[in-house]
């Protein structure tokens, strides 16, 4: 496959324009085309190229430099573009099942063009669509057809004005009326209004509404999803009893219409209940295929993880763009040098390498992890769709919930910090809006809070781990999970006896070193958190109080260390598999080691506190290894960016273009701005209407 491309298949992977980046491209230790083929595969590369080419050649997607669209116009344009994506039909339902990784690939392509477009398409097709598919049954298949024909437009309505992360406190109700075989969807007051719901503001015709299901006799069975029509598809006017509107302008992603809805005794057919987890008979009896409440809860958790798993991919695409812009800039921006006559690229400075290259490694590690986690989610959803009610299926749901709940914070925070570092690493030019880093920062920011506040989600993961340890302590159970993310904990007493014994930088340049340290760290934090929790309870704290007292210094770092270990483990295994071409092993090994050691270095205090590290040498070796790996990857940085960067039209950043003509591109873009050379329309305010100094000063 690689030889075909190297032999001249420039249609798939065309050569880059000659220019200032040539020197770095020539120094790369590997072929960027070979790495692209290994990472993506030829079929996926062709799929992405089809999408990018369609967008670039379609006038509807034309870039408008300097255009300041009104909120209304941006929303309209984003909807028209979303509709056009359906007209292109890049990914059929059949293709989704055949090649599931094309789903996040499509979302990444759209998100690289505009996060608002990706969010709008994702919320309708995948979040709304997968909720109906995985939580519904055969009676809901007609909705699936309408979703992908865009005959209806959907949204996912869980959050309320006064409650988001605390889903148990959601107050929307669904009372069943056996006389009419209908559910009555009701918002008791404005605080129970569904709020922040993407697509609900102006366009959604249907919503998956989460409400407390109650049957006659005041028996309530917790939150269940219902498909509820909120607007007439023919007029987009609200349905009777539904008050629906837009919440207004946001900090970013303003092409997406986030909205609210209140329901005043809205009657929907009994069949509106998405009944995979539980159903109500015509007479009003609640039934569930899950006899064990814990199994039902585990399965439902997994079905709700699709949004969080998608956000991991959305966050990473923003980091890909930011890193591509900053590293191409750094390779062409020359400042200072060993002599006054010779300036060198800022990428040659160890400080710039240390600031940016760990985020490049993070892109590769987290991107691989997000794909693998998506495939895990696909396995779960296929089990749900086939009616698998096994204990393994429920446990898979709980494990994916734990991984998604921690990987969303990790990915969104890493991207948040990475974009800011990229912005600053580009100096003043990074602050110029046309170079896109500010837009990326604002568009990524909601990833930190929607689908669950990051810090709250981390508690979900730490609770999962604490529950496993409690089960082991009280029942002698082994640590086992379907995806094997916790299996290493079975050996935790022996792991805790280990120490960091690497004494040289050379011996530290392997992700296996960080893997061993991470396993110790997770075992240590799990033990310490468990002991702290029990100590707080013995001191009189309730379970609620005890968990909150443990979270800051114990539970939070436990959850982050666990998910970082999982990311490092999966990427380490990926880059060390036998199928890796020999010519790529060195660069992939360095990326894996850099991400692992850089991530681990942020836990140095805990490693010392627990006794895994001792003396100055351990910390110095770790720090020196990170710097050494940055230096080793410096000459490969531009080629590594070439693998992940979209075409210039999509990247849309003058300082990040593939030709490396930094100043030519930036100067040209500045001169193309609207009215850039015209005097201000309010020029008479200076030239004619002079101020009368002191005329407004108080006479008292």
Swiss-Prot record:
Disulfide bonds: none annotated. It holds the Pfam family ACOX_C_alpha1. Its main location: other. GO terms for molecular function: FAD binding; fatty acid binding; flavin adenine dinucleotide binding; pristanoyl-CoA oxidase activity. One of its GO terms (cellular component) is peroxisome. A motif (Microbody targeting signal) lies at residues 698-700. Its EC number is 1.3.3.6. GO terms for biological process: fatty acid beta-oxidation using acyl-CoA oxidase. It is an enzyme of class 1 (oxidoreductase). It is found in: Peroxisome. InterPro entries: ACO, ACOX_C_alpha1, Acyl-CoA_Oxase/DH_mid-dom, Acyl-CoA_Oxase/DH_mid-dom_sf, Acyl-CoA_oxidase, Acyl-CoA_oxidase_C, AcylCo_DH-like_C, AcylCoA_DH/oxidase_NM_dom_sf. Pathway: Lipid metabolism; peroxisomal fatty acid beta-oxidation. Its cofactor is FAD. The modification Phosphothreonine is found at residue 281. It catalyses: a 2,3-saturated acyl-CoA + O2 = a (2E)-enoyl-CoA + H2O2; (2S)-pristanoyl-CoA + O2 = (2E)-pristenoyl-CoA + H2O2; tetracosanoyl-CoA + O2 = (2E)-tetracosenoyl-CoA + H2O2; hexadecanoyl-CoA + O2 = (2E)-hexadecenoyl-CoA + H2O2. Keywords: Acetylation, FAD, Fatty acid metabolism, Flavoprotein, Lipid metabolism, Oxidoreductase, Peroxisome, Phosphoprotein. Oxidizes the CoA-esters of 2-methyl-branched fatty acids. Belongs to the acyl-CoA oxidase family. This is Peroxisomal acyl-coenzyme A oxidase 3.
């Amino acid at each position: 496959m690689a030889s075909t491309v190297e032999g001249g298949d420039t249609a798939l992977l065309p050569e880059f324009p000659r220019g200032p980046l040539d020197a770095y491209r020539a120094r790369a230790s590997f072929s960027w085309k070979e790495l692209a083929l290994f990472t993506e595969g030829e079929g996926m590369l062709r799929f992405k190229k089809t999408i990018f080419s369609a967008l670039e050649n379609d006038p509807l997607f034309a870039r408008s430099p300097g255009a300041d669209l009104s909120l209304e116009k941006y929303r309209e344009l984003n909807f028209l573009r979303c509709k056009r994506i359906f007209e292109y039909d890049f990914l059929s339902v059949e293709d989704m099942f055949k090649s599931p990784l094309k789903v996040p690939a499509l979302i990444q392509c759209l998100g690289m063009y505009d996060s608002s477009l990706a969010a709008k398409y994702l919320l309708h097709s995948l979040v709304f669509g997968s909720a109906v598919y995985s939580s519904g049954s055969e009676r809901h298949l007609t909705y699936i057809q309408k979703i992908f024909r865009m005959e209806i437009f959907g949204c996912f309505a869980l959050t309320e004005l006064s409650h988001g992360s605390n889903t148990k406190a959601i107050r929307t109700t669904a009372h069943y009326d056996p006389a009419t075989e209908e559910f009555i969807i009701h918002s008791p007051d404005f605080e129970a209004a569904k709020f922040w719901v993407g697509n609900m503001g102006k366009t959604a015709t249907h919503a998956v509404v989460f409400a407390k299901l109650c049957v006659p006799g005041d028996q309530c069975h917790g939150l269940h999803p219902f498909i509820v029509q909120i607007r007439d598809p023919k007029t987009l006017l609200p349905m009777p009893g539904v008050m629906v509107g837009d919440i207004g302008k946001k900090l970013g992603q303003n092409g997406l219409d986030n909205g609210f809805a209140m329901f005043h005794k809205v009657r929907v057919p009994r069949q509106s209940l998405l009944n995979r987890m539980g159903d109500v008979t015509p007479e009003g009896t609640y039934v569930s295929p899950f006899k064990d409440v814990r199994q039902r809860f585990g399965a439902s958790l997994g079905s709700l993880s699709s949004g969080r798993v998608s956000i991991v991919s959305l966050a990473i695409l923003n980091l890909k763009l930011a890193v591509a812009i900053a590293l191409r800039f750094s390779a062409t921006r020359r400042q200072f040098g060993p002599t006054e006559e010779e300036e060198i690229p800022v990428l040659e400075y160890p400080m710039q390498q240390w600031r940016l290259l760990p985020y490049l490694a993070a892109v590769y590690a987290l991107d691989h992890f997000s794909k693998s986690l998506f495939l895990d989610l696909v396995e779960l959803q296929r089990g749900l769709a086939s009616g698998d009610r096994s204990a393994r299926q429920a446990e898979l749901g709980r494990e994916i919930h734990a991984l998604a709940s921690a990987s969303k914070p990790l990915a969104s925070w890493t991207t948040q910090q990475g974009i800011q570092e990229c912005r600053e690493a580009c100096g003043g030019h990074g602050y110029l809006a046309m170079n896109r880093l500010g837009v990326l920062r604002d568009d990524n920011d909601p990833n930190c809070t929607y689908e669950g506040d990051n810090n709250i989600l981390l508690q979900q993961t730490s609770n999962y781990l604490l529950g496993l340890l409690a089960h082991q302590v009280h029942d002698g159970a082994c640590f086992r999970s379907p995806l094997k993310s916790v299996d290493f904990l079975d050996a935790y007493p022996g792991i805790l006896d280990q120490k960091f014994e690497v004494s040289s930088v050379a011996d530290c340049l392997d992700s296996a070193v960080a893997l061993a340290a991470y396993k110790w760290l997770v075992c240590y934090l799990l033990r310490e958190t468990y002991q702290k929790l029990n100590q707080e309870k013995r001191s009189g704290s309730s379970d609620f109080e005890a968990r909150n007292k443990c979270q800051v210094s114990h539970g939070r770092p436990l959850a982050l260390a666990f998910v970082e270990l999982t990311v490092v483990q999966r990427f380490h295994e990926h880059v060390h598999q036998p199928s890796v071409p020999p010519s790529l092993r060195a660069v992939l090994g360095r990326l894996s080691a850099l991400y692992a050691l850089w991530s681990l270095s942020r836990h140095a205090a805990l490693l010392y506190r627990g006794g895994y590290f001792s003396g100055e040498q351990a910390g110095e070796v770790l720090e020196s290894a990170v710097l050494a790996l940055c230096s080793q990857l410096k000459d490969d940085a531009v080629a590594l960016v070439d693998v992940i960067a979209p075409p210039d039209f999509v990247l849309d950043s003058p300082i990040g273009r593939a030709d490396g003509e930094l100043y030519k591109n930036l100067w040209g873009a500045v001169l193309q701005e609207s009215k850039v050379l015209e005097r201000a329309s309010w020029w008479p305010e200076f030239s004619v209407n002079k101020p009368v100094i002191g005329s407004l000063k108080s006479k008292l």
